[in-house]
Amino acid sequence: MSEADASDAAPTGREIWIEKYRPATLENIYGQEDTVDRLQSYIDRDDLPHLLFAGPAGVGKCVTGSTPILTNKGIRQIGEIVGDVDGFAPAPQNLKVCSLTADGSFQYRHPSHVFGKRASGLQRIKTNDGATLTVTPEHKLLIRTGENTNPTWVPAADITAGMHVLRAKNLPIPAETTGSCAASKNASEVSHIGDEYRYHDSLMADVNTRIATLERLIEDYAESRSDGSLKFTLIGAHTPTVSTVSYLLATVGIASRHTSTLIDSEKRVHAIIIDASDTVRLEEMIETDWDTVMADQTTTVTSSSTASTTKTTQSYLSSGETQTCGWIPYADGGVTHPSTQHSPLHADVVTVSESLDAEKRVYDLTVPGVRNYVGGCIPTVMHNTTAATAIAHAVYGDDWQNNLLELNASDERGIDVVRDRIKNFARSSFGGYDHRIIFLDEADSLTDDAQSALRRTMEQFADNTRFILSCNYSSKIIDPIQSRCAVFRFSPLSETAIRGQTKDIAAAENIELTEDGLDALVYAAGGDMRRAINSLQAAATTGEVVDEETVYTITSTARPEDIETMVTAAIDGDFTTARSQLQTLLVDTGMAGGDIIDQLHRTAWNLDLDEETTVRLLERVGEADYRITVGANEQVQLEALLASLADTQ
């Protein structure tokens, strides 16, 4: 089965939608406008207290697969790394990707997760230097919008022609390969390179091998131009790829430009161009005795004269990082250049930003801490996918992950969790913010002793830590903790809120959802957004239209009219019909007795009954609910309920 066929056969994938569509920002929360406004006011004032969330359960970016990325194993297509994963999955343990760190250097980091999905409505970005990126509209690139503005992450959909996208110019090689290369140990071994794999191997080699490979590439594929620039012409299956040459040049601090020309309607000629000043530097590197330089272990960066070039170059060739320098782009023959030759970033003008009406499988990586990786045929800094709680996003922005600890008390209940994990996180050092956040879900599952220990911890670390506790029942949280928190009580979601998000998800997943199917989902959810989303995903697995019949079948929920028929028959004295309808719900529909009680309670005031009869029905429902809760037989109690209604006539 092809990838497209597989996608059509299983439109819902293997993702868990309640995680996929969990609100990432306060603006994404449906149906709790007043609570969101209060929370936002704390954040706007930079005065976040301890918080206690109480309420019922359930209230409350990417590139295409052919995109090459720089890893500790060389250049690999991201589609090969992620594979056929749908949604998030753990990343391979031995994988590292090249990422831009906060101090402006490039390092190799372990990604925590990989991500894959089908997506339509892509965005294509083209630059003056020949870079072409096809990404989802929300995927972010590092952009500078004007001459004197700082770089910011901008979604692809908001990028326009004239902006400057930042690309990697000085790339390190992985620390484990620095100084040696299993495939090519010295320059003599690259004297005859017959295919792309050898070039790829030399990309991860020591400086001797990389410089020797570049020398061979110049001999075989390059020509000097009248303006002093150098042009590599690549055509045919046995020439190195554009990405290999571009990345190889970037490991020695040289930015390149890519152009392509279609000839004979079927053959494409690619060219890699480096400007005159970088050509001179490359020639100096080729003439340098790198064995002597490496032996001296020179690491001093000096940029005051041309004679210092070898010292400067060696420092970023032999380490896992690069120097950080300011840069100001200026035009020279259509190519933008950094203000100094040692800047790790290169500014490239966006020429085209266009929407594509196409559907493709897209991929991403999550790199903790730095949240970016180097990718593209010409190395470009790209943002990665991430998700977190809305408040952490609002307070810390992109730095939420280093300042948030999430625990679930129902999984890890007891006093040891409070004493160990929470205290260790609260004590660990951090900088740049007044406090960190510890989020404890289902806090009402903690024992009283654990809550007492938590209260002492909240007091001890009040200066640098804020706690957010979530629970279903605030009455199960001890008073000393409640008194230290701003309490937010989340009400069950309205039908309008559930209807709105359910429709949005159906549209995002290309699901045909009928109006009666939507009504059934809202009814079955009963104010629980998680149940609505789970029910929608379950109904969509059939690959058919999600209608009323599908929803009631999937959720084992009785239609409101079936409940009304049963109750009305009992009140009219037709116990036989009422009992038969009850049997249908228990046996054919597969409902539990407790679920029938819940539906009776929810629909009592919507039935066409007078007030006295409704009160009597609710009284009987309460009695049956209590008896079933303490262990009585469900069918016996429900039949007794119907009999009592019939007996009053």
Curated annotation (Swiss-Prot):
Keyword annotations of the record: ATP-binding, Autocatalytic cleavage, DNA replication, Nucleotide-binding, Protein splicing
Protein name: Replication factor C small subunit
Coiled coil location: none
The keyword Transferase appears for this protein: no
Description of post-translational modifications: This protein undergoes a protein self splicing that involves a post-translational excision of the intervening region (intein) followed by peptide ligation.
Family classification: Belongs to the activator 1 small subunits family. RfcS subfamily.
SUPFAM superfamilies per the UniProt record, alphabetical: Hedgehog/intein (Hint) domain, P-loop containing nucleoside triphosphate hydrolases, post-AAA+ oligomerization domain-like
Originating gene: rfcS
Subunit structure: Heteromultimer composed of small subunits (RfcS) and large subunits (RfcL).
An example molecular function term from Gene Ontology annotations: ATP binding
Functional note: Part of the RFC clamp loader complex which loads the PCNA sliding clamp onto DNA.
Annotated binding of ATP, by residue: 55-385
